[in-house]
Regions:
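Flavin-dependent oxidoreductase catalytic core characteristic
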Residues: 1-147
Length: 147
């Protein structure tokens, strides 16, 4: 709706991409292939976990990311059902790395909104951000400056 009226304007490829987005994780097993790649890397190179957690650091001063990293570390204590949990594990790794990169990028409005909505149990659907975020700064950042 936000990219084409009531969802019927199709002057570009964008509506098709949005329409197909829900099935992207199942087409040709791409989501599962990514999970298998993560599991394969973990089994072939056990040191990859040390590299991952070294990269994530201590949360870069954000308590929510630090808690996510601790929860992620706990997921590796019992690996008896790791194949069953592979999708959740892969998602948690990706979310942690995304949050870390956003914090490093230095735009606190964007990183705060991402972490609040992805790591802190905030709304995950479009337009459902938790209260108290600097959404004006996010909008201003993405609004073109016209001379």
């Amino acid at each position: 709706e936000c990219m084409g009226g009531a969802g019927y304007v199709e002057d570009s490829i964008l509506p098709r991409l949005y329409r197909e987005a829900p099935v992207n994780s199942t087409w040709e097993g791409s989501g599962n292939v990514q999970c298998l790649d993560v599991l394969r890397a973990l089994s072939k190179e056990p040191g990859v976990l040390d590299v991952l957690f070294s990269e994530l650091g201590d949360g870069h001063g954000d308590k929510r990311l630090a808690a996510h990293i601790q929860q992620l570390q706990a997921q590796f204590k019992d690996t008896s059902d790791i194949q069953y949990r592979a999708r959740q594990l892969t998602e948690d790794i990706a979310l942690g790395l995304q949050a870390k990169l956003l914090l490093e990028a230095g735009n606190s409005a964007v990183s705060d909104a991402f972490i609040a909505s992805r790591l802190s149990g905030g709304g995950r659907v479009y337009g459902a951000l938790p209260r108290g975020l600097d959404v004006e700064a996010i909008v201003a950042r993405s609004t073109p400056q016209i001379l």
